[in-house]
Amino acid sequence: MTLPVPDVSKNLFDLNGFCSIVTGAGKGIGLTLSKTLAYHGSDLVLVGRSTRELEAAADTIRAIGRKVRTVVTDVTAEKAPEMIVNTAMDMSRRIDVLINNAGSMTFADMLGVDDKIWDDIYSVNVRAPMRIMKAVLKEMVKAGRGSVINMGSSWSSRASVFNQDGGGVDYCSSKAALQALTRAAAQDVAPKGVRVNNIAPGAVDTPMHADHRDLLYQFVKYIPMGRMGVAEDLAGTAVFLASDASTFITGQTIHVNGGMLMVD
C-alpha cells in the first residue's frame, strides 16, 4: 500500500476524531497521558483495575469535552483484550492509538528471583501488552493506520534499578523484552500503515513509587537536567507518537529521562 505523507499545512498534533486506548489510566502516567490526548482532541477508552479511579478519570475527560468509556479489568485477564477492543469499537468504530501503560515493578536480584516473581512481572509487562496490542493491531491493520505506544523504561538499557549493588533483574529484563517486542511488531505492521513505538521513561515520581520514593530520589544526582521526572514530561512525546507528526517513525524507543543515559 502507498503510505500517506503528512500535510504540513495542517496542525500535525491535532487528534480530533481519534479514539485512544490507555491502560493503567486511573492514576500517574496513564491519567496524565489520557488527559493530554483529550486536550488535543481524542476520545478515550480508559483501562484499569479500580472503578473509583477510572470513574474519576472519566469525569475529567468529560469535563474536557471528549467522549470516554471505561474498562475495569486486570490487563492480564484472559478476556481483557476482547473487552478493550469491543468497548472502543462500540464507542467510536475505530481505534487510532493504543498506549500500553499498565505495568508492574519489583526488585528481585539474580540469586533471589523465583519463578513466581519472574512469571508475575512478565505477565504484566510483556504478555499483557502483547495480547492487547495483537487485538488492537487487527483493527488498525484493517483501517490502514494507527499508532501503538508501549511504555518501556530506561532501565531496559542499564542494570540496577534502585541501588548500586544490583536488583531489578526481573523488571529490567521485562522492559528490555517489551522494547524488543516493539521493534518486531513494528516491522510486521509497517507495510500496513501502522506504527509501533516505545517510550522509555527514566526516574519518574508517580504513585507507583510511593513506597520507595526516598530511594527514587537518590537518582537525581545521576540526572544531568537536575531534577526528578514527572508524568507531564512524557506527555509531549506521547502526543507526538500518537499524531500525524510522527507518521514516518516506527520501531523506535524514545528515552525521556533528563539525560540520565548520557552518563555512567
Predicted regions and their residues:
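Alpha-helical segment proximal to the catalytic Tyr-Lys
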Residues: 138, 183, 187-188, 247
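Substrate-binding pocket helix/loop in short-chain dehydrogenase/reductase
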Residues: 109-110, 114-122, 219
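Active-site helix of classical SDR
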Residues: 133, 174, 182
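Short C-terminal tail/terminal secondary-structure segment
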Residues: 2-14, 158, 239, 250-264
